[in-house]
Amino acid sequence: MSGNTLGLLFSVTTFGESHGPAIGAVIDGCPPGMTLSAEDIQPDLDRRKPGTSRHVTQRKEEDLVEILSGVYEGKTTGTPICLLIRNTDQRSKDYSNIAETFRPGHADYTYWHKYGIRDPRGGGRSSARLTAPTVAAGAVAKKWLREKFGIEIHGFMSQLGDIHIPFMDWNEVPNNPFFAPNAEIVPELETYMDALRKDGDSVGARIEVVATGVPVGWGEPLFDRLDADIAHAMMGLNAVKGVEIGAGFHAVSQRGSEHGDELTPEGFVGNNAGGILGGISTGQDISVSLAIKPTSSIRTPRRSIDKAGDPAVVETFGRHDPCVGIRATPIAEALLALVLIDHALRHRAQCGDVSVETPAIPAKAS
């Protein structure tokens, strides 16, 4: 397989390239009978789309989604749902100077060796442009999870470069272009990004995403553990170089007496496990953290080679995000939703008749 599909029972296959006529996704396995329209999907696409502030790429794409199949009289039919997003603001000439060279840190070199051909326009299939159909499919998954289980999925940026963003208020996340949960730090982030763009450089970020309301019992040990599938999906997001579940790498310095979340009749005392034990959801919040590397396409001259193997200097003049992490929050939310809906359907298929009434403890201790 070519690695373009995520999920087993709720599977999503994306298609297209950054500068092609359109990009999109085909969802196979969406349960029938759910009301669905473009208006259910568009808000998440609007959160991700480019050109929304001076701190992201200035490529102007409306990212209007079209539902081509799988919906009849406003309801899903259980047949494949095709979602289409047309590209309208390509500038392929911006990439003519890198067609024969390889950008340091980019997929140019590896795509060339794997396929013997590559599309240099905007990175082709390796472009973050291809996260738009993922977000569209994720919006469908979010809706089903919310309506069937009351599950809510929200994300935020917790670090931009070396600036840590203390969590203050979920309500602040939609009020700034950084998805930062802290209004007080936004001016500092803006100043930082303005200087970075002036320097022609880029920077990384850390994104947190949380799912609340997930029932206990989702996940398939051993190799399809819920946390393993979450990590697999998140690593499929452009520029992600690390994934943590719960305490993550902090678990290295914790003792067992500290890390193991104690159970009481009133609930779990902590959530170092990130809502997952033995690959199966505990009923607590599922918490995931992503490390996103700096954008590879920058104006700063970098040493490289051309297709003949000769030395070259690469400068990229296209419209690029100086920090791809700024727009990554809705993408991370979508990926978590896609993994959760797939495991919800898998759990229903195998264990739908299983009912364990006791013990049942709250997700959090009071």
UniProtKB/Swiss-Prot annotation:
The cofactors named for this UniProt entry are: FMNH2
One annotated Gene Ontology cellular component of this protein:
cytosol
Positions of NADP(+) binding: R48, R54
Q: What is its EC number?
A: 4.2.3.5
Question: Which InterPro entries does the UniProt entry name for this protein?
Answer: Chorismate_synth, Chorismate_synth_AroC_sf, Chorismate_synthase_CS
- State where FMN binds: R125, S126, S127, N238, A239, G278, K293, P294, T295, S296, S297, R319
Pfam families, from UniProt? Chorismate_synt
Q: Which UniProt keywords apply?
A: Amino-acid biosynthesis, Aromatic amino acid biosynthesis, FAD, Flavoprotein, FMN, Lyase, NADP
How are cofactors bound according to the entry's free-text note?
Reduced FMN (FMNH(2)).
**Which pathway, per its entry?**
Metabolic intermediate biosynthesis; chorismate biosynthesis; chorismate from D-erythrose 4-phosphate and phosphoenolpyruvate: step 7/7
Q: Which Gene Ontology terms cover its molecular function? A: chorismate synthase activity; FMN binding
Give the stretches traversing the membrane: none
- The main enzyme category here is lyase
Catalyses which reaction(s) = 5-O-(1-carboxyvinyl)-3-phosphoshikimate = chorismate + phosphate
**Example GO BP:** chorismate biosynthetic process
Subunit and interaction comment: Homotetramer.
What does the protein in this record do?
A: This reaction introduces a second double bond into the aromatic ring system.
Q: Which family does it belong to?
A: Belongs to the chorismate synthase family.
* Protein name (record): Chorismate synthase
- The species is Ralstonia pickettii (strain 12J)
